[in-house]
Amino acid sequence: MKKLLLSVMSLMAMNGAMAQTAVGENDLANAYATQTITGRIAVHDPSIVMDVTGSTTNPKYYIYGSHLGRAKTYASGNYQIWKTFKTGEENAGTSNSLFAGVNDKLVNFKDAYSTQLVKKVKNNKGEEVDFPNFDAHAWQAKGNNVKGMQWAPDVIYNKTMKKWCMYMSLNGDNWCSTIVCFISDDLEGPWIYQGPVVCSGFSGRYAHNGFAASGDWKNTDLAIATGCTSLPQRYNTDEWSPYGPNCIDPCVFYDDDDNLWMSYGSWFAGIFMIKLDKENGLRDYTYTYPYQVKGVTTTAGAADANATSDPYFGKKIAGGWGVSGEASYIQKVGKYYYLFMSYGGLTAAGGYQIRVFRSEKPDGPYKDCLTSTGIDAMYGKYILNFGGDAKRDEGVKLFGNYQWETMPNAELAQGHNSAIVDHKGRALIVYHTRFLNRSEEHEVRVHQLFVNQDGWLVAAPYEFSGETYTDNDIATRQLYDATEVAGDYQMIAHPYRQNTAAMDYEKPVTIHLNADGSISGEYTGKWELVSGTSYINLTLKGVATANAEVKFKGVLTEQTIDYTNIKALCFTALSSSDGLATSGGASLQTRGLSIWGSKADAKAAIKYTLDKTSVPFADGATLNSMPKLPTEGHLGATISWKSSNPSILTDEGVVKGKGKVTMTMTVSKDGYEYTKDYTLNIDAEAEETTPVYYPVSAQKNTTSAWWTNFSADYKLQAGKKVQFKFYNYSNATNNWCNWALYGANKTHGVAGYIEYFGIRCDNWNNTANSNVGCVSNYVWDTFKNDMNGSLVDMTVEYAANGAFKMTATITTTSKKVYNYSFSTTIASKPSQLNLFFVNEGSYIDGSSLSTGISNPIIIQKKNDGKWFNLSGQQVDKSYKGVVIVNGKKFVNK
């Protein structure tokens, strides 16, 4: 394709001519809002399916997962708002049961695996034979229960049967597992046991719930599939792995020729594939498999871990040798079948991550893009393939642990995904994720997938939120011109060797896609668009190593930044066919690296930065020393300072003299800038003015979960004090559903975080799990209602010897006044504390506080005194509209 090479002369002229557009309080008033998603669902190993029998314009989508996890949504909910159904199904009895017996009467889930519908099948010779009843619970290892062992179902509509088919793995110890098929006329059940599809663990070594160890294979379909009359030597082994798979994690799909396939398996022997019978949804026994080692047909003997095809288990397509890799899922997108796998362990520190391979055929070979010819998804020996100590990188890593700054917690251990092309032609990936600081809690997330120029999948940087563009739009339309693309971006790179055991995660850095086609900032390089498309090419130095230049091919799309309504132009890109770099004569493995970029709306980013920035002084303050100036912007915005008199105070905040000085803070992004003047009196001998802050929770609602709704951070130097003023709003459900003040060494969620205290409003220190140091005169009978809407006036002091004290006066809406204090000594005596508020089922808002405004009258403008808008927020003299100065109101035009 012809590339749109940016005109250097015209764009350089544009650079030189670009003026900054000033914005004031009015321009930023409604620049953005935070968003809360209340329909989150916790379904582990989510498999998504569209109800093809219902509405075509707003169809229902279902997800089923392990342990009978289930939920549904309408497409109009953007795959974020889910609702469970048939709650309580896992209890005793049949109330709300998902399952029925062969007589159509509801049965409890534990009894759903005992009696099958199918009585006859065709064997490996095409002969119709009896299909003996197979009790899947009886096949589980002795002592195993059904509850807790129903893993990772996959659901598909069988067009021939005109039934929904659910493929469920009933796991057992010692590989005594079975994948079975249930059928239903409705996606919500009841599901009836159709029959077994494939089972494992028939080595004759392990006792089952319903069968003895010896001769256990006779109770399976092994003879029907292979014609054997005795247990073949390869299965008669003390160590099932690394030859035999564990029959879990099914994925069922149609190929382009309408054949029905199932992939399955996990660590141990790897991922296998068998063909299914469209007439009954079970295994197609007439489709046979040779015994092959390394792709060569040979006489079967003892177990060989290099076997690539087995007469019973089918064709191996990935993994093997006990190497990590499970949760296979195959989805056709465009030209290729894409094989998704989850490497690593599923816990928060386990390193779970999604890898992708592709093939032009449904049964492979599946390869990645990490070499010019691709690395096969199968392994020939054991090797560690995930985490910081990995010995080999394989498979395109879609993304790893990460956190955009609007996210309350970093995503960790994303995996066991499904994928779908929805009713509007948008490819989506559906996965579960764990989170930093949330133990092993997990939730479902959905991102859009795109195909880049080289035919590799790339994931959109943010959650899917109703975006409409498809791969066809990207390939055939230039949705954005060069002037729209140029600007300030946050970027996240997803390395292979992430220290997942330490729960490390990637955070955004700032880069600038300059109008002349260059890239500056954290990484340097160049960029270009591809004419007539929405593809973007980037060459970046520093992503893989300091000196390596890596080429990326990606896609441009507009998205909504997570947990906000802020629009952002995003890129998602992959280093693939030409991504191998050379540095210092050494060849570096840089293929398969995924990167994300996000160019937030400029005004929203400026406003977000202002809301998240704590200036450690007020206009007119007297300072006997200069606190650290905030210089870190957000969402790609930057903060700079300019002194009116560097001989008194430099731009960097270094005190040089004594007297009055004006410090001007400028927050800028993409041609817009906001400025604010602070007139300060610098006097080393004067009593310092206590700074007053008006903190605001990120989410202004009373439904937020614990450790998700934070204020900005506030720095408190040893020997200093600060004041906080805010209103507290609560759902009044529990005493702890109110503000909590935390003190730590750095921002929550950052590596190396050390917590000193967590003072709850209700007389409790969360960190110490004690009320030691808390003193109050609360009336507990009315406490919960008293706190809702209360005004909090708090002073916090921290001494150089580590002594910390908080005193608060709390005024209720009925004018009752409470006094609350907390004191402690921090043994390590840090030179600075990082303070922040966090709320559960509540929020705080200091932005709406009055600022000493008396009854207003209209008079002429005065040029002295502090300016406030009608919301009580301090503004500068460029503000247009009604303002209050010295308690008087006037209109500034």
Which ranges hold each PLM region?
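Sec-dependent N-terminal signal peptides
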Residues: 4-13
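Short, aromatic/His-centered strand-loop micro-motif at the edge of beta-sheets
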Residues: 771-793
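Secretory/extracellular carbohydrate-interaction modules
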Residues: 698-768
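Short tryptophan-centered beta-strand motifs in secreted/extracellular beta-sheet-rich domains
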Residues: 250, 724, 785, 789-799, ...
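Carbohydrate-active catalytic/glycan-binding domains of CAZyme proteins
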Residues: 20-601
